[in-house]
UniProtKB/Swiss-Prot annotation:
Role this protein plays: Involved in the third step of the chorismate pathway, which leads to the biosynthesis of aromatic amino acids. Catalyzes the cis-dehydration of 3-dehydroquinate (DHQ) and introduces the first double bond of the aromatic ring to yield 3-dehydroshikimate.
CDD domains assigned to the protein according to its UniProt record, in alphabetical order: DHQase_I
Protein name per Swiss-Prot or TrEMBL: 3-dehydroquinate dehydratase
Binding site for 3-dehydroquinate: E30, W31, R32, R62, R186, S205, Q209
Involved pathway(s): Metabolic intermediate biosynthesis; chorismate biosynthesis; chorismate from D-erythrose 4-phosphate and phosphoenolpyruvate: step 3/7
E.C. code: 4.2.1.10
Gene name of this polypeptide: aroD
Keyword Amino-acid biosynthesis appears in the UniProt entry: yes
Superkingdom in the source lineage: Bacteria
Subunit structure: Homodimer.
């Protein structure tokens, strides 16, 4: 599994304070731009991409529709993403497919999409249908993060991931059952076929997220 570490600066000073040496163990850096005001994203972007030079970067605006911090209408959302993507060519671009379906066609020019679905309330009964639709679009990555309320939720996420990966071997999946119960899904990629996991430096970006150092230790034990 590749470890993705989110960074969530709220201003330029916090960008400049990021210790790049602490990111050394990360395989990919996710810039969570929703911690900034919309009009500050392009101002801060040059410093972010300079800091992350040499690392793969996922550009993410997690909106309030899926548990994030920025409230953007459909066109605002796609416009900011396209501006950053065009100017700075991040390795991956997160797109909240179900929340912004009406503007998805405007993103088809980008082959590096992470089509994501987030549900902080539950593991929905139509999980398989959601995963099937996202997979059918053949993005760079299918990402699904749902809240685990029961042990069965955790097992379901792992089983569904294993099934979809076995049928779509070339597709990259990143599946997470959030919360304390779901921690196992964050390190079980060797079994399930989930290819990415998310870990924190300091502040977590989702419930149940483990530290970068602990995640690396667990993966080394399980994968070697």
């Amino acid at each position: 599994m590749k470890i993705v570490v989110p960074i969530m600066p709220r201003n330029l000073e916090e960008v400049e304070a990021i210790d790049v040496e602490r990111l050394a163990e990360a395989d990919i850096v996710e810039w969570r731009a929703d911690y900034l005001l919309k009009d500050d994203i392009l101002r801060v972007a040059p410093a972010i991409f300079e800091k992350c030079s040499g690392k793969e970067v996922v550009f993410t605006i997690r909106t309030t529709r899926e548990g994030g911090h920025l409230d953007l209408d459909d066109q605002e959302y796609v416009n900011v993403i396209k501006e950053v993507a065009t100017l700075y060519q991040p390795d991956y671009i997160d797109f909240e497919y179900y929340s912004y379906k009406s503007v998805f066609e405007q993103m088809l020019e980008f082959p590096n999409l992470v089509l994501s679905y987030h549900n902080f309330e539950e593991t929905p009964s139509n999980y398989m249908e959601i995963m099937s639709e996202l997979t059918s679009l053949s993005p760079a990555v299918v990402k699904m993060a749902v809240m685990a309320k029961t042990e069965q939720d955790v097992l379901d996420v792992m089983n569904y991931t294993r099934g979809f990966k076995s049928l779509n071997t070339e597709q990259i999946f990143a599946t997470i059952a959030m919360g304390e119960l779901g921690k196992l899904t964050r390190i079980a990629g060797v079994i399930t076929g989930s290819c990415w996991t998310f870990a924190s430096l300091d502040e977590t970006s989702a419930p149940g997220q483990m530290s970068l150092s602990n995640t690396r230790k667990f993966l080394e034990i399980l994968e070697n």
